[in-house]
């Protein structure tokens, strides 16, 4: 492993240890009737669980088999639950301080046990709800008006499905469900702006095989996300191309008068590389004597001033998952602002950010719904 990935792993593991320690210390302080033996067992369990997701992730990058898939799923589910236990622990500590120092209760210590029981029970219910909610994919219809839209595109329908994260958790059956839902919408074209794969080891051809059943008459177009570029993107790009999907790796195509472009995530993550990639496409458009590109597949809703300056009318993005679960729904909003999800304007550029169909990490959605987007060109 190179130095930067190792450092990132160590930082993530340190955060997980800190979070588990806070949950553990709060639980033993507030949960009634714990024996010394139970506390010791809990301490060992929390150490193992704190290590579980990083270990499972490393295994999933090297091996692909049912045992690793089960380990990864269990670790990811626990990651979701401990997230809610951590939030619950913060609430318990704050509520206890309020009860203790408000002097409104004669015996505040009597509330310690019931307080923990109620809050941790809510955390468990939130996790269960998240598991169920993540499997219910909504169809979101979005009317789109593009000033330079060719007349031939008016009234056409495009399906946008991002962030499927095909891998140990979202397998081939999940892909079939997404394809079936998309097919029912009878799209003229399909856009996939990244993270079709989770980036883990697996039978890539098998995972994307259901996509062969999608047959929009104007094609399917894909640009890479960060999960296709964790290692070498070539294996993922090749698997996607083999099912008949056009991969736009800093490339553009003209489809019935509409120019569609895609930028690789690595290049979009740098302003200089992003500008160079779009300038190259703009130069090719000028040399051919045709109009500027109209639609850009850009995995993350970033570099908007550069995209607008390059003359695009519509950017299609994913990446954010809308935050996926609380409190990351709030954190993501702080990072991406209004472009966290939905359709918004940046100057002359329209930007649609999808919350995605799949999940990463915890297979849960709380405070945010998974979606397939139907774009209706007006």
Name every feature range the model reports, one short phrase each.
Residues 1-135:
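Non-catalytic terminal accessory segments
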Residues 145-378:
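Soluble catalytic domains of enzymes that build or remodel membrane lipids, polysaccharides, and related
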